[in-house]
Amino acid sequence: SISRVNALLIAVFVVVTSSAALADTYQFGQHIEPAYEGWRPNADGTFSFMFGYMNENWTEQPDVAIGDNNFFSPGDADRGQPTHFLPRRNRFTFEVVVPSDWGERELVWTLNVNGIERKAYATLKDDYLVDNMVIASETGSLGAGTSSPESRANIPPVVTIQGDDIRTARVGEEISFVTQVIDDGLPKARRESTTSESDLQRRMMRPPTRITVGKVNGLFLSWNKYRGPGNVTFDPPMPKPWEDTRTSANSPWGALWLPPEAPEDGLYEVTATFDAPGTYILWGRAD
């Protein structure tokens, strides 16, 4: 879990060819806030700026191509940012490496979604320096700001795609790929509950009471579309990597969520099906 601590992100490129609301929530039509999460130094003297976003929609997943509505400045407009945006809060989604002589300059990510423009400003100010414990805290793994020897000893999972990073598929036909995930088992996952069915139903109907962002710790792998023109369907269905706080959500931020059973050999097999031709980037997160 990103108490793990630093969710590992990997990408697979796929070329697909064609063959013969509630009162105070929003489902569609809202904007996206790009978010600067912080920075960390790299061993070679460079620095990594970390970004995420807040999609104000609960349902709409906008696709925003690199260009006037999705760009970085100064310099290259394309810094590896997503063009497909999952619902709600997505933290520490990608990193941009800047040189050792970056100094006091700003790197700005601009997004214009549903007619509203927002910017995130990245700098090397001391207040934005983060480490694994900060990431764990910000993503809810530590609850209300507590830590333990176990959480401090936790290291990120190691994720490896088996086979080629670039695959070719046909529209409507499944392709399969295997991901190896090696993890230290920390923090320990919550055991399955023996709660009665009636008590479980009451808990599902109870409004959330968390005073800060909180998640259920437990290893999971989630594949999602990062870039691409059409929809991608994954099988088995993936846990959500975004903060779906609804009680019954298939998300670590859902109050009753339980981690899926991890394969003994650490090998996760997933199939993906594409509904439109084009070039895709798939985003894998082990957490």
PLM feature spans:
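Extracellular acidic, Ser/Thr/Pro-rich low-complexity tracts
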Residues: 55-57, 167-170, 175, 181-188, ...
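Extracellular Ig-like/FN3 beta-sandwich strand-entry sites
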Residues: 104-106, 174, 265, 277-279
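Bacterial N-terminal signal peptides
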Residues: 6-17
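Low-complexity "stalk/linker" and mucin-like segments enriched in Ser/Thr/Pro/Ala/Gly
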Residues: 77, 82, 200-268
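Residue-level recognition of secondary-structure-to-loop junctions
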Residues: 41, 262, 268-276
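Short beta-strand segments of immunoglobulin-like
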Residues: 36-38, 164-169
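Proline-centered linker/hinge motifs at extracellular inter-domain junctions
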Residues: 128-165, 187
